[in-house]
């Protein structure tokens, strides 16, 4: 059993290494998929993957209303992991809100929309972009296992570049379809999480992008009680 776990970790690490070897303006982030069940519910997640290190936060002030925030940071350093000489850096953050409901005891539906902003930076050029997104999710949430399918739509606008600190106004926009699978396994309050998805441009693009993403990490849920799962 232990050897199987090591094999899985090794495979995921290899995939992540391959994906992160490609530098691009737009690195699609893993969506925030809370699969909430009640009001006054708080969820926190941390992950590592093809877009670097990520953090996710979700809160429901009232039943049917969710507020989310998440971000990612990723960099490639010349001279090793502890070097300050960065050849590439990517930073992105977003916030969203929307509707969710319990279809029945375990099935969930949620529809979130939001805004994000980020940049990609190499030794010469800093490329800034904004994103508007809409993400419906169809999922299952239980005491041991969670699963969700999220066909996200993202509108990405590369609005400015800085070449040697000289700003250049840009207007490069593209729409992406980004289907993603989310799986979590563990206990009621603590679960391990893995997410993976693809990114397809709906038309032409005038900037570079990564066409897939994967991450793994953990997910915490804080609620008044867990009677909803029983």
Q: Where do the PLM segments sit?
A:
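Outer-membrane beta-barrel transmembrane domain signature
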Residues: 116-230
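Short glycine/proline- and aromatic-enriched beta-strand/turn motifs that initiate or cap beta-hairpins
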Residues: 22-81, 223
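Short hydrophobic/aromatic segments of transmembrane alpha-helices and their interfaces
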Residues: 7, 48-49, 218
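Gram-negative (and chloroplast) outer-membrane scaffold detector with strong preference
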Residues: 59, 64-155
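Outer-envelope beta-barrel architecture signal
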Residues: 36-44, 53, 63-65, 105-111, ...
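Residues that act as N-cap/strand-start positions at coil-to-secondary-structure junctions
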Residues: 38-40, 51, 91, 132, ...
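Intrinsically disordered, low-complexity coil segments
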Residues: 10-16, 52-54, 78-86
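Cleavable N-terminal export/targeting peptides
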Residues: 1-30, 225-230
């Amino acid at each position: 059993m232990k050897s199987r776990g090591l094999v899985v970790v090794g495979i995921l690490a290899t995939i992540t290494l391959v994906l992160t070897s490609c530098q691009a303006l737009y690195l699609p982030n893993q969506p925030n998929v809370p699969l909430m069940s009640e009001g006054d519910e708080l969820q926190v997640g941390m992950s590592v993957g093809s877009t670097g290190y990520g953090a996710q936060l979700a809160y429901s002030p009232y039943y049917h209303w969710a507020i989310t925030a998440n971000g990612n940071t990723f960099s490639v350093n010349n001279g090793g992991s502890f070097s300050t000489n960065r050849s590439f850096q990517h930073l992105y953050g977003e916030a969203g809100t929307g509707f969710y409901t319990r279809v029945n005891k375990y099935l969930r539906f949620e529809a979130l929309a939001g805004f994000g902003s980020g940049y990609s930076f190499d030794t010469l050029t800093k490329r800034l972009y904004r994103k508007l997104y809409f993400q419906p999710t169809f999922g299952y949430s239980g005491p041991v296992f969670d699963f969700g399918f999220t066909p996200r739509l993202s509108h990405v606008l590369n609005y400015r570049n800085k070449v040697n600190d000289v700003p250049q106004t840009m207007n490069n926009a593209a729409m992406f379809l980004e289907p993603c699978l989310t799986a979590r396994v563990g206990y009621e309050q603590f679960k391990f999480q893995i997410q993976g998805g693809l990114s397809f441009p709906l038309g032409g693009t005038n900037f570079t992008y990564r066409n897939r993403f994967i991450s793994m990490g953990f997910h915490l849920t804080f609620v008044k009680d867990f009677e909803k799962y029983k």
